[in-house]
């Protein structure tokens, strides 16, 4: 859960934007597919951040992308530190976000229910 308060929300949003730019523009790992950073949850002390990522593709492709992101965590954190100028850069933990898949599944169910007589 993101830290309540304006500073926590702003920092989480900045981390989300910067990590998304780093992933899309600088990471060259072939395991990482089309990944979208969907959100960031910060701990209360700003020392830990869960970065939620949605990846297109099969479950195997998603897992490989997650492995690629995890292996690039040190680089992403270093780049984040140089961009944000924080006293202490949060430890990053990448997590697959299945919300988009769940939304698609629910929309399919609702369409089917709507089309039933």
Where does each model-flagged region fall?
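Charge-rich, low-complexity N-terminal segments
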Residues: 1-48, 54-117
């Amino acid at each position: 859960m993101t830290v309540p308060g304006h500073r926590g929300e702003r920092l989480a949003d900045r981390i989300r934007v910067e990590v998304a730019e780093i992933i899309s523009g600088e990471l060259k790992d072939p395991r990482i597919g089309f990944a979208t950073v969907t959100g960031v949850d910060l701990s209360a002390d700003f020392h830990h951040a869960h970065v939620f990522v949605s990846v297109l593709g099969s479950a195997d492709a998603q897992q490989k992308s997650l492995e690629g992101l995890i292996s690039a965590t040190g680089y992403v954190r270093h780049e984040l530190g140089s961009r944000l100028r924080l006293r202490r850069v949060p430890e990053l933990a990448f997590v697959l976000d299945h919300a988009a898949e769940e939304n698609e599944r629910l929309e399919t169910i609702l369409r089917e229910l709507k089309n039933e007589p």
